[in-house]
Design a protein with these regions (language model features):
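Short, charged recognition helix plus adjacent turn
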Residues: 1-2, 14-17, 56, 64-76
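Residues that mark the N-terminal boundary/hinge immediately upstream of a DNA-recognition element
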Residues: 10, 21, 47-50, 61
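Short, basic-rich loop-to-helix N-cap that marks the start of a DNA-contacting helix
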Residues: 43-55
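Conserved hydrophobic/aromatic packing and binding residues within compact polymer-binding modules
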Residues: 11, 25-26, 36-39, 65
Length: 76
């Protein structure tokens, strides 16, 4: 069974596809890198403002940012 779970696997995958580091994402969201890293690990959940901004930055028009990746589904 995989340790990938919302939002970690999808958020990391989208960020890397866009070529952003955690530091760059944090800067764009005006939060600390640690806070952003906590979103990816699932230790913290982003507020609505940051969810909307992440979707804009990552080019996600729907709520795919919050769905598990295909790898996560197949590993369950």
């Amino acid at each position: 069974m995989s340790n990938n779970y919302y939002p970690r696997s999808r958020l990391i995958k989208l960020r890397k596809q866009k070529g952003f580091t955690q530091e760059q994402m944090a800067r764009l969201l005006k939060i600390t890198r640690t806070t952003y890293a906590n979103y990816e690990t699932g230790y913290r959940s982003p507020n609505l403002k940051n969810i909307i901004e992440m979707k804009k930055i990552l080019g996600v028009e729907d709520d795919k940012i919050f769905l598990p990746t295909d790898d996560t589904i197949s590993n369950k």
